[in-house]
Amino acid sequence: NCLPDWSVYEGYCYKVFKERMNWADAEKFCMKQVKDGHLVSFRNSKEVDFMISLAFPMLKMELVWIGLSDYWRDCYWEWSDGAQLDYKAWDNERHCFAAKTTDNQWMRRKCSGEFYFVCKCPA
């Protein structure tokens, strides 16, 4: 039940987009493409292999945005001695994750970076 130019695997539809966007714009783009669309998430290594089989022939050695990030909420941070983190001196840049199309290693990148991306939705 996927759209004609999408690929199906284990009850989900996938599409690689060869257009560079930042993480938030790519996520919004996926949400507009199809009902319940999002940047790709992975349940197991076979799903990863499937995504690589789609992305590598089209993109070669590139990074693609995946749905993992701390974009929507802050992680819980505390000092090693247990003190609360009340004073913060880091930049406000959020971190998102991109996957290598060669071996799917996940790499933390600034969410403002622009990469290709893969969308996923239920079939």
Curated annotation (Swiss-Prot):
<feature type="disulfide bond">
    <location>
        <begin position="30"/>
        <end position="119"/>
    </location>
</feature>
<keyword id="KW-1199">Hemostasis impairing toxin</keyword>
<dbReference type="InterPro" id="IPR001304">
    <property type="entry name" value="C-type_lectin-like"/>
</dbReference>
<dbReference type="InterPro" id="IPR050111">
    <property type="entry name" value="C-type_lectin/snaclec_domain"/>
</dbReference>
<feature type="disulfide bond">
    <location>
        <begin position="96"/>
        <end position="111"/>
    </location>
</feature>
<dbReference type="InterPro" id="IPR016186">
    <property type="entry name" value="C-type_lectin-like/link_sf"/>
</dbReference>
<dbReference type="Pfam" id="PF00059">
    <property type="entry name" value="Lectin_C"/>
</dbReference>
<dbReference type="InterPro" id="IPR016187">
    <property type="entry name" value="CTDL_fold"/>
</dbReference>
<feature type="domain" description="C-type lectin">
    <location>
        <begin position="1"/>
        <end position="121"/>
    </location>
</feature>
<comment type="subunit">
    <text>Heterodimer of subunits alpha and beta; disulfide-linked. Forms an active complex with the pentameric immunoglobuline Mkappa (IgMkappa).</text>
</comment>
<dbReference type="InterPro" id="IPR018378">
    <property type="entry name" value="C-type_lectin_CS"/>
</dbReference>
<dbReference type="GO" id="GO:0090729">
    <property type="term" value="F:toxin activity"/>
</dbReference>
<dbReference type="GO" id="GO:0005576">
    <property type="term" value="C:extracellular region"/>
</dbReference>
<keyword id="KW-1201">Platelet aggregation inhibiting toxin</keyword>
<comment type="similarity">
    <text>Belongs to the snaclec family.</text>
</comment>
<feature type="disulfide bond">
    <location>
        <begin position="2"/>
        <end position="13"/>
    </location>
</feature>
<protein>
    <recommendedName>
        <fullName>Snaclec echicetin subunit beta</fullName>
    </recommendedName>
</protein>
<comment type="function">
    <text>Echicetin itself inhibits aggregation of washed platelets induced by vWF, thrombin or alboaggregin-A. However, when complexed with the pentameric plasma immunoglobulin Mkappa (IgMkappa), echicetin binds specifically to GPIb and activates platelets. This is caused by P-selectin expression and activation of alpha-IIb/beta-3 as well as tyrosine phosphorylation of several signal transduction molecules, including p53/56(LYN), p64, p72(SYK), p70 to p90, and p120. In vivo, it induces thrombocytopenia when injected into mice, probably accounting of activation of platelets rather than inhibition.</text>
</comment>
<keyword id="KW-0800">Toxin</keyword>
<keyword id="KW-1015">Disulfide bond</keyword>
<keyword id="KW-0964">Secreted</keyword>
